[in-house]
Design a protein with these regions (language model features):
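Blade-loop segments of beta-propeller domains
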Residues: 67-100
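Beta-propeller domains
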Residues: 49-70
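Peripheral, non-catalytic segments that deliver or gate enzyme domains
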Residues: 32, 54, 97-98, 103-110, ...
């Protein structure tokens, strides 16, 4: 790892032009050297998550000389996903177990506390059930945390970060609540989701009793308290009347009046940028095409600093993962569609930025392909946002196209930034189409819920409409189109073919769901109340409808070459899903090409050699059917 000191005007070097170069597959998929940098409250230290195959370890560095001061490793399949500094010498680590590259954590994460030099390590009792609600700089031994009791309510407590002792502050009768607290940790509001997914907002009155002020069932609207204003009286809410993207408002509880602060007609906020003393809301971040900030307080000194830093990186998206508590040091992350990103530490007193780390220094932006935001109109008039990536140095006309739906599907979305799979496919000459179909997250509750019970119908039609757009625009050759996705994207890759049997020349399903009724019986989702409620909410009620939306029950409509990829250790989408589709295709006399790893891999492959083997075979498969190796269009 290298570091250097740079003045702001010299932060960016102009990239020279370059002809398309075939980049080795391993360069796209090998782990970054680091990710998830966090800054200590003094700005003296950083922590860095370091992926190492089937685990992610943590390292701490002293910023002045980038010397290692501590390292933490919790073993195989354990990943240190998040670090939260609780005072200037100590932080919490959230350690989860994951069984695949596309997996969310399995079970409740473990939480450990440690000093930055590795001393005074502690297993935080029940730590994975806690969410940190507030830090208390005036009381560095304690933080304010919340956790669901398991009895239908949520408890707010003070937690001693050195001995793990807990003292209850308040309890609210909401199953899974987030509290809004004052600077000294006193709860004022609570908002959460009940087991039936109803949203509830409550306010704490002067007599310490909680009063319900809003429920989503009664109003059909959303009314979510986010944080107290710096005056200690008014409250920042996000509100939506009919499921449209929520707008940020400042509410005065004394009068009930709300003042608009920020909104975007297309997307919801992704996070808030606050002052170093955490009192003032400075800006709201949106991911509308390319990520950006909307400053709500343009005159605050720290807002001026942030705006200047954004202007210093004109061709990159800029995020601010941390600021020292005295406001003097700002952690800056700058990245783009062709640049995996670098971290800098900006000193507000000197006006200079020190380069800290770049996670994938071997990636050359001038060899990558531009990802362009697009807007597509669906057949029912709904506006769909997405991205098209055109191979570098191509003329962008009549290209072989990969429709690449994202996983999830509810909550996640595709965004602008460096995507190894997309860049690999573009580097091999394929245009890549990503569309945020209805059901995707980030575009408001109404948009997300419009995909419920329509996994295999309207959501798929959105993808088809996006492909038709690419054909009309002259980007895609209509006789050279394949689909590829993972998890829900793997399901969609097959269901697009079921719904449009003659439109595609091949399809690839990676750890995909292919039998919706089986989701209610197998895998880790139906093992929890939340998971069972989720399945009932997003899938059709009748077995016949579920089967109609399942590729495994529509084998007769899948008449093109299929590749299936799965890991035998997958708990999110178990091998039974793969078996249902594979066996059906074999019985129909159309056996798929298959990659099944039986030993270590789960919901997405971790091992680099396994990934290289997978994408090598994928490249050959795509080339045979829509690439240079395709002798003629494949007839269904």
């Amino acid at each position: 790892m290298t570091f250097r000191s740079l003045a702001l005007p010299l932060l960016l070097a102009a990239a020279g032009s370059a002809h398309a170069v075939e980049v080795p597959i391993g360069d796209f998929f090998k782990d970054p050297e680091f990710k998830n940098v966090s800054l200590s409250p003094s700005g003296e230290y950083i922590t860095v998550s370091v992926p190492q195959g089937d685990r992610t370890v943590l390292a701490a560095f002293r910023v002045a000389d980038m010397q290692l001061v501590g390292k933490w490793d919790y073993g195989e399949k354990k990943h240190i996903d998040e670090v939260v500094w609780v005072n200037d010498e100590r932080f919490f680590m959230y350690v989860s177990r994951k069984l695949g590259r596309f997996d969310f954590h399995v079970g409740t994460p473990d939480v450990y506390a440690s000093n930055v030099d590795g001393t005074k390590r502690m297993d935080v009792p029940n730590g994975g059930t806690y969410s940190i609600r507030a830090l208390t700089p005036d009381d560095p031994s304690n933080i304010v945390v919340e956790r669901s009791s398991g009895l239908g309510d949520t408890v707010l407590s003070k937690l001693n970060v050195y001995n793990g002792q807990v003292r209850t502050i308040a309890t609210v009768a909401i199953f899974d609540a987030d509290f809004v607290v004052t600077d000294d940790g006193e709860p004022m509001y609570a908002h959460g989701t009940e087991k039936d997914l109803t949203q509830v907002t409550m306010r704490r009155a002067g007599d310490n009793k909680w009063t319900t002020i809003h429920t989503s069932n009664e109003s059909g609207s959303e009314h979510v308290p986010r944080r107290m204003h710096g005056d200690g009286e008014r409250v920042v809410f996000e509100v939506s009347k009919a499921g449209e993207p929520m707008q940020v408002v400042l509410m005065d509880p004394a009068t009930g009046e709300s003042t608009p602060l920020s909104s975007n007609p297309n997307v919801e906020s992704t996070n808030f940028l606050t002052s170093s003393d955490r009192k003032d809301l400075l800006a709201v971040r949106y991911h509308d095409g390319i990520p950006n900030y909307d400053f709500v307080d343009e005159t605050h000194p720290e807002s001026l600093t942030y705006a200047g830093l954004i202007n210093a990186f004109p061709d990159l998206a800029v995020a601010f993962p941390g600021i020292s508590w005295d406001g003097k040091k700002v952690l800056v992350y700058a990245y783009s569609d062709v640049d995996p990103g670098s971290y800098y530490l900006f000193d507000r007193e000197t006006g200079k930025a020190k380069f800290l780390l770049a996670g994938r220094e071997w990636i050359k932006p001038e060899q990558m392909s531009e990802m362009k935001p697009i807007v597509v109109t669906a057949r029912d008039g709904r506006k769909l946002h997405g991205y098209i990536t055109i191979p570098r140095d191509s003329d962008g006309r009549d290209l072989p196209l990969i429709l690449h739906p994202h996983g999830g599907p509810h909550g996640p979305r595709d965004g602008w930034g460096f995507n190894p799979e997309v860049q690999f496919l573009a580097n091999r000459g394929f245009a890549v189409l990503q569309i945020n179909f209805r059901g995707s997250g980030g575009y408001g509750t109404a948009f997300e819920q419009s995909g419920y019970r329509k996994w295999g119908t309207a959501m798929i039609d959105d993808m088809t409409d996006a492909v038709d757009w690419a054909i009309r625009e002259g980007i895609a050759d209509k006789d050279r189109i394949c689909t590829y996705g993972a998890s829900y994207g793997g399901y969609a890759a097959l269901q697009t073919v079921v719904r449009e049997p003659t439109k595609y020349q091949c399809t690839i399903g990676y750890v995909g769901v292919y039998d919706i009724p089986l989701m209610f019986k197998d895998g880790d989702i139906p093992q929890s109340d939340w998971g069972r409620n989720y399945l009932r909410k997003v899938h059709p009620e009748t077995l016949a409808e579920q089967q109609a939306q399942s590729p495994a029950f529509n084998i007769d409509r899948i008449r093109i070459p299929v590749m299936l990829v799965h890991g035998e250790k997958d708990e999110r989408v178990p091998m039974s899903q793969y078996d249902r589709l594979h066996d059906g295709l074999v019985k129909a006399g159309r056996p798929p090409e298959m990659i099944v790893l039986e030993d270590k891999e789960g919901h997405g492959f971790y091992d680099l050699q396994n990934q290289v083997d997978l994408y090598t075979k994928m490249e050959a498969f795509l080339d045979r059917h829509i690439g240079d190796g395709a002798a003629a269009p494949v007839s269904p």
